[in-house]
């Protein structure tokens, strides 16, 4: 097929229509839609509830585990246990951690009751956010949740889909 502007427009319209129907296709496949916001720092902010308590989180595909700061122990009623694992990320390494197992996580209408959380000092994350006047977060929703929920991120429409 010879390439011309008509073919380019047709290809664009075809892919746009496919994206437009994405929500309907995923809904039929039992995916739940969760909206997120993009901050000035290009982080994806998402609202979640842990053990029935609401919080603000960064959605981070590069974080292997979901985590909360130490203040989250009381806030989310976590049963924290000491851990030998050291955390690293966002410019900090070798940080002391604790673990909290079998927590309930709810992201809009999607939920799980077996979420293990890493607990560590998130002050470096929130300090970086505050430099851009972005509100602090309670934690990070990581790849563990995305994998468990077979996550699909629609960056254009600011939606996460979980099954």
Regions found by a protein language model. Name each.
Residues 3:
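Cationic, low-complexity basic patches in intrinsically disordered or flexible, solvent-exposed regions
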Residues 6-163:
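Pepsin/retropepsin-fold aspartyl endopeptidases
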């Amino acid at each position: 097929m010879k390439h011309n502007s008509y073919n380019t427009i047709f290809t664009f319209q075809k892919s746009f229509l496919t994206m437009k129907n994405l929500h309907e296709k995923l809904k039929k496949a039992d995916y739940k839609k969760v909206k997120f916001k993009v901050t000035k720092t290009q982080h994806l902010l998402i609202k979640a509830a842990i053990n029935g308590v609401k919080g603000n989180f960064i959605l981070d595909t590069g974080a292997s585990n979901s985590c909360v700061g130490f203040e989250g122990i009381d806030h989310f009623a976590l049963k924290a246990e000491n851990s030998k694992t050291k955390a690293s990320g966002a410019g900090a390494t070798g940080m002391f951690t604790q673990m909290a197992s079998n927590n309930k996580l709810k992201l809009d209408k999607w939920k799980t009751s077996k979420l293990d959380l890493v607990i560590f000092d998130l002050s470096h994350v929130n300090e970086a956010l505050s430099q851009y006047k972005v509100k602090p977060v309670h934690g990070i929703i990581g790849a563990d949740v995305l994998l468990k929920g077979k996550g699909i991120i629609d960056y254009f429409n600011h939606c996460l889909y979980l099954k």
